[in-house]
Amino acid sequence: MLHWGPKFWRALHLYAIFFSDAPNWKEKYEAIQWILNFIESLPCTMCRHHAFSYLTKNPLTLNNSEDFQYWTFAFHNNVNKRLNKKIISWSEYKNIYEQSILKTIEYGKTDFIGAWSSL
């Protein structure tokens, strides 16, 4: 079975982390299009439906990277709740990605997914 979930989350969280702190309209538009295309490409039909439903009920907040990160954090926790997986706090999320970014910078790689893979 193809385990696409962790790769999806990694891409989504990293996109939000590296999103601009002062995005212009083009960056916001591109982020929205990226999310829509990304959700559309999910290999699981039910997952696509749930993701679009979540997006409709919880529109993206793209004022800055922190807002975008919080949206991805809440989305990930929403999915984890539905799957009876662990829900993490915002501070846990921040710690996970900050450590991941430091590892990425220091070693040129990240274990960002490893931290979330069991969630």
From Swiss-Prot:
Gene3D superfamilies per the UniProt record, alphabetical: ERV/ALR sulfhydryl oxidase domain
Disulfide topology: C44-C47
Source organism: African swine fever virus (isolate Pig/Kenya/KEN-50/1950) (ASFV)
GO molecular-function terms, A-Z: flavin adenine dinucleotide binding; flavin-dependent sulfhydryl oxidase activity
Entry protein name: FAD-linked sulfhydryl oxidase
Cellular compartments annotated: Host cytoplasm; Virion
Cofactor or coenzyme needed: FAD
Alphabetic keyword roster: Disulfide bond, FAD, Flavoprotein, Host cytoplasm, Late protein, Oxidoreductase, Virion, Virulence
Domain of life: Viruses
Species lineage: Viruses, Varidnaviria, Bamfordvirae, Nucleocytoviricota, Pokkesviricetes
PANTHER family found in the cross-reference section: ALR/ERV (PTHR12645), FAD-LINKED SULFHYDRYL OXIDASE ALR (PTHR12645:SF0)
Family, as annotated: Belongs to the asfivirus B119L family.
Described purpose of this protein according to its UniProt entry: FAD-dependent sulfhydryl oxidase that catalyzes the formation of disulfide bonds in viral proteins produced in the cell cytoplasm.
Segment forming the signal sequence: none
Pfam families: Evr1_Alr
Annotated InterPro entries: ALR/ERV, ERV/ALR_sulphydryl_oxid_sf, ERV/ALR_sulphydryl_oxidase
